[in-house]
Structures are given as C-alpha cells and as structure tokens.
Design a protein with these regions (language model features):
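Auxiliary Fe-S-binding modules of radical SAM enzymes
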Residues: 1-34, 225-373
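Conserved, mostly hydrophobic/aromatic
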Residues: 40, 68, 106, 159, ...
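Catalytic cores of alpha/beta
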Residues: 142-151, 208-223, 281-291
Length: 373
C-alpha cells in the first residue's frame, strides 16, 4: 500500500474532522493490521454484540436513462430489461420472506417513466406487511418525493455516491441525470429531512484512487453523523464486479487493504454500521464477520424477477435506450440482465450456519414500526 492520499476533501462540502484524522492514521499509519483487527473486533463486540443483521436486495427494474461506464444497467448496454409490476414485486418479497428474511432492500435503475415515485411507494406498501424493515436504493429524490416513500412504510435509504472525485465522477457518468454530482451528494440529507431513520452511504471501489475515496467517505460519514444525528448511519465500500459492458476497474484494491479499510472504519466510527455485500468472496466475508461488519446480504439476485422468474414474459432488449423485441423464443430461456455478478452465492441458511460456527447470532429482525408508531 502506498502513502497517504492528498487533498481528498477538496471541493466537498465537509471538512477534516478529528474522526477523519483518526481514520487516516489507522488506514495509512504504522499500526500493524493484526493489531488494528483486534481493536476492530473489540469495538464491534462492544457496540454491536455478537449479532449480524441479514438482508436481501429485491430488484424492481433494470431500466435506466443514465449512461454510466461501469454499470450493467447503463442505457447504452443492449441488455434484457423489465420493470416488475407491484404484484410481481410482492411475489418476489413473499419468496424472500419464506426463506427467513425480515429486512429487504428495494433496488432500481433510474427511469422516471418506468419507475416513478408513486410506483416506488406502491412497491413499498406491498412489501411492508412481510418485512419489518424496508429500505430503498433508487435515484436521488426531492424531500417531498422521499416523504411519499417514507409514508408508505420505508425506513431506510441507501444512496452511494459511487465516487467522491469530481473529475472521475464526470468521466464515469457520461449522460443522464446521474451526472449531477451535488444532487446525489446531498440526497441522504434530503432523505433524512423526509423521515428516514437509517441512512446508508458508500463508494464504489475501482473508479478512482481508492485512498482518496475512503478519506472522502470518512468525511461524508462524519458530516452525516452531525446533520442527521437522529438516524443510524451505515457505510459500504463495494468493489467493482464484472457486469454487462465489460468495464474494467481503473484501480484495484487488494484484499489486505480492503480488510484494513473495514477495520479502520470500525475503530474510527465505532457506532456506524458497516455493510458487506455478496460482491465479495465467501472466504473474505467469513474473515470479516467479526472484524467490523454489522450487516450482510445473502442469496442475492441482482436482476428483477431473479428469485421467482416473474416478469419474464415482458422481457425486452434496449439498444441505446430504444426498446427492441427479443428474438422468437428467446424470452423462454432468458432472464433479465443482472446489474453485476455476485461472488458469494451462499443461501441465507448457509450464511447463517457460517455465522453460528463463529459464535455469532444471525439477526433477521431488529426493528418494528410499533416502536415509532
């Protein structure tokens, strides 16, 4: 690992706090990884006990109006697309609930016509009876739009900045509303104003210098902990995975540096939740179970209809945003295109077993709406 990053916070609306300085020292200083890992283990046990919250993503649509170089859903990719109907979303949700999940993340590409706010709210209403905890990961919205989703029953908002490097962000987001860096950056605060009780932010490793990205993420977290002080703040640092379009990471982050980053965030931000998705391999996820991670996904499908096959009859292909019918018979053997390839394909049951082997308790439900009714 090379030295400390330069001006990672330049041009961002938050500064270098004591917590950010602490993170930098842990991440780029002289402390040995083994020592840092032990500190992270102690802080995790102290603040979160022996628990691991489990959740599953549920994709609503892979339609998108943005052209993003790295994303499988990018408008320019000629992929198979579909937007699930609310009843189909409910069918996917019932399947996940039947496997034990009580926390779900509703995910969608950005397409105002195919995925309007009213549709999102209806999908939330369909899933709320099955899941005590419903979160959304969709395009940035305005406060009144977020409020509609909160009133429908959603309690969590996930909005990753992708990259905090303005130049890299502009290069990666070629066209579409996602090009607006600041609109996205301020989205979590608008979500908080609308009433979300859990706010998740993150950076996609592979788009720019990951050292600067991590410091900027630390700055964002420190800022949100002050301005969104009633909410639980969570973070994630997913690494790029293969996806339609074939984009290759601009910079790689080793497993050792990834582990160090998780541990450094845990020690510098002891009460912040850390999310680890199925992008990472099973062996690495196993190793991080006790070192700072507090939320894990399992058995994930990253395409709409991936759990039950619903919506298959309406599959179509798009070429630069224009809809093209599938070839005769193609839909019978095809599925919607996934956003990215997962690495850890273990089921929820298998992941629960791995957690218990390490003395950890899988938590399917950790909140109920009656607590705030």
């Amino acid at each position: 690992m090379s030295g400390r990053p330069g001006s990672a916070l330049e041009g961002l609306p938050f500064g270098r706090t004591a917590q950010v300085a602490r993170f930098e020292e842990l991440m780029f200083g002289t402390v040995r990884l083994e020592e840092l890992a032990e500190q992270a283990r102690r802080e995790t046990r102290k603040n979160f006990g022996k628990t691991m919250r489990l959740f599953a993503p549920l994709y609503l649509s892979n339609e998108c109006v943005n052209t993003c170089q790295y994303c499988g859903f990018s408008k320019d990719n000629p992929i198979r697309r579909v937007t699930l109907q609310p009843a189909e979303v409910e069918a996917e949700a019932r399947h996940l609930a039947g496997t034990g999940f009580r926390s779900v993340l509703l995910v969608s590409g950005e397409h105002p016509r195919e995925v309007p706010v009213a549709y999102m709210a209806e999908c939330v209403r369909r899933t709320v009876p099955l899941f005590p905890s419903v979160a959304i990961e969709v395009a940035p919205l305005e406060v009144d739009e977020y409020r509609q989703v909160v009133e429908a029953g959603a309690e969590g908002l996930v909005l990753y900045q992708e990259s905090y490097d303005r130049a890299a962000y502009a290069e990666m987001h070629v066209s579409g509303p996602k090009r607006n860096f600041d609109e996205r950056l301020l989205g979590p605060e608008r979500g908080y104003a609308a009433g979300f009780r859990r706010i998740g932010v993150g950076v996609l490793i592979g788009l720019a210098d990951w050292r600067k990205e991590l410091v900027a993420l630390a700055g964002h977290i420190s800022h949100l902990m002050k301005v969104c002080w009633r909410a639980q703040v969570t973070l994630a640092l997913p690494r790029l995975r293969p996806a339609a379009g074939g984009f290759q990471p601009r910079v790689a982050m080793s497993d050792r540096d990834f582990v160090r980053a998780v541990c450094a965030f845990r020690v510098a931000f002891p009460q912040v939740g850390i999310v680890l998705s199925t992008r990472e391999p099973a062996k690495l996820r196993n190793g991080l179970m006790e070192l700072g991670v507090t939320m894990m996904s399992a058995g994930s499908e990253t395409e709409p209809g991936g759990y039950t096959g619903v919506g298959k009859a309406r599959l179509h292909r798009t070429v630069r945003g224009r809809e093209v019918a599938l070839e005769a018979g193609e839909w019978e053997r095809a599925e919607a295109t996934e956003q990215f390839e997962i690495s850890d394909d273990r089921s929820a049951k298998e992941l629960s077993g791995a957690l218990r082997q390490r003395g950890l308790d899988p938590v399917w439900k950790d909140w109920d709406r009656a607590l705030t009714a």
